[in-house]
């Protein structure tokens, strides 16, 4: 019995020691924060799953069966004790993570450790571990350097650390919440040191394989000799990871491109498209430069990284400057102060395109704010959204909303600020990727006076391999203006611009209050609000129509549309297609010559003069434009099925305008049921999305928030 008691006491002591090692969090630097969730050790999980561990655990459990410990304590102690008796590998793990508590300088391992006839060297400046060679076994190659080092060994002109943070998955991508979270959870990380003949390299580590902060892992390895010069010149590569889930990481990694020039690349652990909903960042009065991880460091003359300045609201009726994007210039070699030489300047399209070419997947920022301004009628909201798709994965690469007070805008020669328009032109140019190519783009606006509405003119530009279309926007004096850029070769890529005027103009809607007998008893403001909702719902339906078209889904899938109605619409499309000379003709079905004024009256409650003739005229113009497009040799071919669907969209779009405005004289009785069914389906987003299996892939704008 005394012998068993001694063994039992030793097992308990050693078990407590191991449990402290494997379940406790390792102290970190004063200016770093460890992960919220405790780190798990893969080695321990591996040991516990072995059959020999179970056998030893049962043996210990039988020896301790008569003790006074609880059943849970018995199982825990026996499992640990069984693991100790089963294998000597735990000794290796215990030695590797056996760091003393205290400051960082007191937690370093000894220079060499001999375990199982294998010597593991550790240098003095490695404070938190080192990647082990394969000689110690495959289960011991996951210990990584954790992101801090002695500053004396860093070759940098400045010792400024990297500033980073983590945005939890549950947080909504709203500006205010992210700003408050970032201000309270900023984390400073020092760079990887550069020493002698050892170059530092980066690698991803799974969340359960890290012994320190679970969202940063820097692996130190001597085998990356090809990066040695880069490390010596730049002071070591840096990695910055932001995540929502512990196993889904986003990193900014520096790589070597065969020359001294370095590129900023992005990748994700799960090989999915990166979405900037993960990386919404804001600081007080300053737009955070995402990806600009070398902002304060010297020795990076070869870097030209794109910086993003996110507009943030300072007060309720603030007028925001139109510097939507900024690019940091390379430092002037004559200037000794690297920090001051990296000044900010207004960005251009060429800067952004050149930078995006050096990135695996071009991306920008997404933010959704200004919702509290909805009750201010004097404020105009601008929203720019760019969607990019590769395969079946959708990614929002840019959404920005800017809001301008009407009085301040009116002071700029009655038009929108030229700087904003310039940035809008540049923003649309970021689609100059292998999928899209826009040689030039111009946005024209009209005066914002009360007597004349503003809208965007139609534009159509072609390049060598692609043709870009911009749907001619139909301006509604209260509601919104949409401009859609569409590439016929890549129907899953398009650009949507929304210009919303929250206050009705006097030239149209206010006059209808005097002539509409059914609204004479309604107050003016209430009537305007009703019309605004109606117009906004209509345009929202139109946008969904375009997105519906991009998925090439047939109209017969819409609930409530019978086969006869679908066949009738198909015959209508075939009738238009018959105007083309051959089945292989290039078809472009966009109302490129329609003016905004030509369809503006269809959205009012006043009856149209010669409505049937007006529709026939519009259809004739539409077909003539298609015939002219076929004669252009630079245009690419298009599928006839897609053409029929697009024409159907245009036809139903006009019918919907008449249906909403109660202009039933334009609609025949045969089409009324179809238009009503399609209109109702679009107005009910959940029902409309559930109709098509492919709809969850799309990104929908619902109350100013993008829903995937």
UniProtKB/Swiss-Prot annotation:
Membrane topology reported for the UniProt record: Multi-pass membrane protein
GO molecular function: toxin activity
Keyword Cell membrane: yes
Disulfide bridge partners, by residue number: none
Subcellular location: Cell membrane
Primary location recorded for the protein, binned into one broad class: membrane
Transmembrane segments: 77-97, 380-400, 466-486
Subunit structure and binding partners: Monomer.
Protein name: Killer toxin KHS
Protein species of origin: Saccharomyces cerevisiae
Gene name of the record: KHS1
């Amino acid at each position: 019995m005394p012998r068993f008691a001694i063994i039992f006491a030793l097992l308990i002591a050693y078990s407590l020691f191991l449990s402290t090692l494997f379940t406790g969090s390792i102290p970190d630097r004063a200016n770093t924060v460890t992960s919220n969730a405790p780190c798990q050790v893969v080695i321990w999980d591996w040991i516990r799953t072995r059959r020999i561990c179970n056998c030893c655990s049962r043996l210990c459990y039988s020896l301790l069966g008569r003790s006074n410990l609880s059943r849970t304590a018995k199982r825990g102690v026996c499992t640990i004790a069984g693991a100790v008796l089963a294998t000597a590998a735990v000794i290796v793990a215990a030695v590797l993570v056996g760091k003393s508590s205290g400051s960082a300088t007191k937690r370093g391992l000894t220079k060499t450790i001999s375990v199982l006839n294998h010597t593991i060297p550790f240098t003095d400046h490695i404070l938190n571990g080192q990647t082990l060679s394969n000689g110690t076994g495959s289960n011991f190659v996951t210990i990584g350097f954790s992101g801090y080092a002695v500053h004396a060994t860093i070759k940098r002109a400045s010792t400024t650390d990297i500033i980073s943070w983590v945005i939890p998955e549950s947080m909504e991508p709203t500006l205010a919440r992210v700003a408050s979270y970032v201000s309270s959870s900023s984390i400073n990380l020092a760079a990887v040191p550069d020493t002698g003949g050892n170059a530092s390299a980066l690698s991803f580590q799974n969340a359960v394989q890290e012994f320190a902060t679970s969202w940063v892992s820097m692996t130190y390895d001597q085998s990356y000799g090809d990066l040695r010069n880069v490390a010596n010149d730049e002071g070591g590569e840096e990695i910055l990871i932001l995540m929502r889930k512990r196993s889904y990481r986003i990193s900014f990694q520096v790589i070597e491109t065969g020359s001294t020039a370095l590129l900023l690349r992005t990748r994700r652990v799960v090989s999915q498209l990166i979405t900037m909903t993960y990386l919404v960042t804001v600081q007080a009065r300053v737009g955070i430069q995402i990806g600009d991880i070398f902002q304060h460091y010297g020795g990076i003359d070869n870097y030209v990284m794109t910086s993003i300045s996110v507009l943030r609201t300072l007060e309720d009726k603030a007028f925001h400057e139109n510097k939507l994007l900024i690019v940091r210039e390379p430092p002037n070699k004559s200037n000794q102060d690297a920090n001051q030489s990296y000044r900010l300047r207004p960005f251009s399209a060429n800067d952004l395109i050149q930078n995006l070419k050096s990135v695996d997947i071009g991306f920008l920022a997404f933010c959704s704010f200004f919702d509290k301004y909805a009750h201010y009628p004097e404020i105009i909201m601008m929203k720019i959204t760019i969607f990019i798709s590769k395969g079946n994965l959708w990614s929002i690469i840019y959404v920005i909303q800017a809001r301008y007070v009407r009085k301040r805008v009116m002071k700029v020669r009655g038009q929108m600020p030229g700087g904003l328009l310039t940035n809008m032109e540049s923003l649309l140019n970021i689609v100059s990727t292998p999928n899209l190519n826009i040689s030039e783009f111009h946005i024209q606006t009209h005066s914002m006076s009360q007597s004349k509405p503003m809208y965007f003119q139609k534009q159509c530009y072609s390049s060598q391999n692609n043709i870009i279309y911009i749907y001619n926007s139909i301006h509604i004096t209260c509601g919104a203006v949409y401009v859609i850029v569409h590439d016929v070769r890549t129907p899953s890529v398009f650009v949507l611009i929304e210009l919303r005027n929250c206050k009705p103009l006097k030239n149209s809607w206010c006059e209808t209050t005097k002539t509409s007998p059914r609204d004479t008893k309604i107050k003016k403001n209430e009537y305007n609000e009703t019309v605004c909702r109606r117009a906004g719902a209509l345009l929202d339906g139109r946008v969904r129509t375009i997105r519906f078209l991009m998925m090439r889904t047939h109209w017969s899938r819409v609930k409530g549309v019978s086969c006869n109605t679908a066949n009738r619409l198909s015959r209508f499309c075939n009738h238009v297609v018959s105007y083309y000379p051959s089945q292989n003709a290039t078809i472009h079905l966009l109302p490129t010559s329609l003016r905004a004024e030509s369809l503006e009256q269809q959205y009012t409650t006043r009856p149209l003069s010669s409505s049937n003739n007006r529709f026939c005229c519009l259809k004739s113009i539409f077909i003539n434009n298609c015939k002219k497009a076929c004669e252009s040799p630079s245009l690419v071919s298009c599928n006839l099925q897609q053409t029929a669907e697009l024409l159907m969209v245009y036809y139903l779009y006009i019918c919907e305008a008449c249906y909403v405005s109660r202009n039933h004289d334009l609609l025949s009785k045969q089409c009324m049921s179809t238009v009503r069914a399609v209109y109702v389906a679009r107005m009910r987003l959940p029902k409309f999305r559930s109709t098509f299996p492919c709809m969850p892939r799309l990104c929908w704008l619902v109350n100013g928030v993008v829903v995937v």
